[in-house]
């Protein structure tokens, strides 16, 4: 009797697996379909965007400039590559953080929408003739402690993020705007 129950369970399991697999395999077939199957072109289409200027590593901002503007000692550049940099106090994740990001072929509107959903305010801004947004984040104990500036360059944009974790601190938006100005001046 025990073998019969086990055999029945295995048969049921096999039937269930077949019920799942058969529709999946059938979905891969175009049998009975009146739709023609298109070919994939091997020639590249005109999918390249219109890129803005080139930005040097870290937006052209040195570690010394970051320390001077933020008034934070012991800043360490913990992430540095061709599209962004991040500075942390003492290299740790607890404390103030500052970052530069360069988004090639990415819509600034999506980033702005994210900011609108998560920040206290988001406004239009123009820096050196380039438009974008400025987003302010605040915390009850700190006030306005975070500022992000995103500036569009055709199909690209850059973003500076400045965030403090304890008082006193200089104006996050003053710093973010100055870093953005300097990065624009450093672009080619």
Swiss-Prot record:
It is a lipid-anchor. The keyword Signal applies. InterPro entries: DUF3558. Keywords: Cell membrane, Lipoprotein, Membrane, Palmitate, Signal. Pfam families: DUF3558. A lipid is attached at residue 28 (N-palmitoyl cysteine). PROSITE patterns: PROKAR_LIPOPROTEIN. Residues 1-27 form the signal peptide. A lipid is attached at residue 28 (S-diacylglycerol cysteine). GO terms for cellular component: plasma membrane. It is found in: Cell membrane. It comes from the Bacteria. This is Putative lipoprotein LprB.
């Amino acid at each position: 009797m025990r073998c019969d129950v086990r055999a029945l369970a295995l048969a049921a399991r096999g039937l269930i697996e077949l019920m799942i697999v058969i529709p999946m395999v059938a979905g891969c077939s175009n049998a009975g379909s009146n739709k023609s199957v298109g070919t994939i072109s091997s020639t590249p289409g005109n999918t390249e965007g219109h890129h803005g200027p080139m930005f040097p590593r870290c937006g052209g901002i040195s570690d010394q400039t970051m320390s001077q503007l933020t008034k934070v000692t012991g800043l360490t550049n913990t992430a540095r590559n061709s599209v962004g940099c991040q500075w942390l106090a003492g290299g740790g994740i607890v404390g103030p953080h500052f970052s530069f990001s360069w988004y090639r072929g990415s819509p600034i509107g999506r980033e702005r929408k994210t900011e609108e959903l998560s920040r206290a305010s988001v406004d239009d801004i123009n820096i050196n003739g380039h438009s974008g947004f400025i987003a302010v984040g605040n915390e009850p104990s700190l006030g306005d402690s975070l500022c992000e500036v995103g500036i569009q360059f055709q199909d690209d944009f850059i973003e500076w993020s400045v965030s403090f974790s304890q008082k006193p601190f200089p104006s996050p938006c003053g710093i973010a705007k100055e870093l953005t100005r300097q990065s624009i001046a450093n672009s080619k």
